[in-house]
A protein has these predicted regions:
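NAD(P)+-binding Rossmann beta1-loop-alpha1 motif at the extreme N-terminus of oxidoreductases
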Residues: 2-60
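Internal alpha-helical scaffold of NAD(P)-dependent oxidoreductase catalytic cores
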Residues: 2-6, 100, 125-133, 139-204
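Short, glycine/charged-enriched secondary-structure capping and boundary segments
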Residues: 29-32, 52-55, 84-88, 122-126, ...
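Short, charged/polar "capping" segments at the starts of alpha-helices
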Residues: 44-49, 116-118, 161-165
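A short, aliphatic-rich alpha-helical micro-motif
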Residues: 62-67
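N-terminal Rossmann-like NAD(P) cofactor-binding module of classical short-chain dehydrogenase/reductase
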Residues: 70-71
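Conserved NAD(P)H cofactor-binding loop of Rossmann-fold oxidoreductase domains
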Residues: 74-75
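Rossmann-like NAD(P)(H) cofactor-binding subdomain of soluble oxidoreductases
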Residues: 78-143
Length: 204
């Protein structure tokens, strides 16, 4: 378990897990923001497409690099019923991260839509060796120009240290200041920034 101290995290290497429509869009955006961006998918063809179309570096082993951030974009509904949640892929990914991640204190951000209680299950699998946030996407394939990756969104963190890590990542640009707004509104419980983020501590 992490010893919670004042966070001063540096994010460089980001791994996007799940390279479908959402994951590929997220990977492209993360790369555009200046991060060293990698991708993983159980479908090797998806990794090849991400590499060819966007230069996303494919990986099979989460321990092959010392990743600072794991962004989970795997599907969370049954293949034949989009209204029935299925979190096996999320938990399998979390288990793989738990077994293979080299860096204690890295950030795990779940961007997939998940049912209540899922973040807590992921957090327990990781035993707070890594920070966990839920930053549900608002990306819409049919209107990507208006509803792309960079939108105001809500972030929930299991602990305050998780929220701080999530906020730092989602407002980091690796020096590309033109890619985000500078203004950040802070209150005792709510933080607003871009890619953009409205952050509330909660335990799901």
């Amino acid at each position: 378990m992490l010893q919670v101290t004042d966070l001063a995290m540096t994010f460089s290497k980001v791994l996007i897990t799940g390279l479908g429509q959402l994951g590929l869009a997220a990977a492209k955006y993360v790369k555009e923001r200046g991060f060293d961006t990698y991708g993983y998918d159980i479908n090797t063809e998806a990794m090849e497409i991400a590499h060819r179309s966007a230069g996303i570096k494919p990986v099979a082993d989460f321990g092959s690099h010392e990743f600072d951030v794991y962004v989970i974009c795997v599907s969370t509904h049954k293949p034949d019923d989009i209204f029935s949640p299925q979190i096996d892929g999320i938990l399998s990914t979390a288990d793989k991260i738990s077994r293979e991640a080299k860096k204690d204190g890295a950030l795990v951000s779940i961007e997939s839509t998940i049912p209540k209680g899922t973040s807590k299950k992921v957090f327990q699998l990781l035993n707070h060796r890594l920070h966990v946030v839920h930053a549900p996407h608002r990306w819409y394939a049919l209107e990507e120009k208006e509803h792309g990756v960079n939108q105001l969104r809500v972030i929930g963190g299991v602990y305050n240290c998780c929220i701080r890590a999530g906020m730092q990542f989602y407002t980091d640009t690796k020096g590309n200041e033109d890619k985000r707004e500078r203004d950040i509104l802070v209150s005792s419980t709510i933080l607003i920034a871009t890619w953009g983020s409205l952050c509330i501590q909660y335990r799901t």
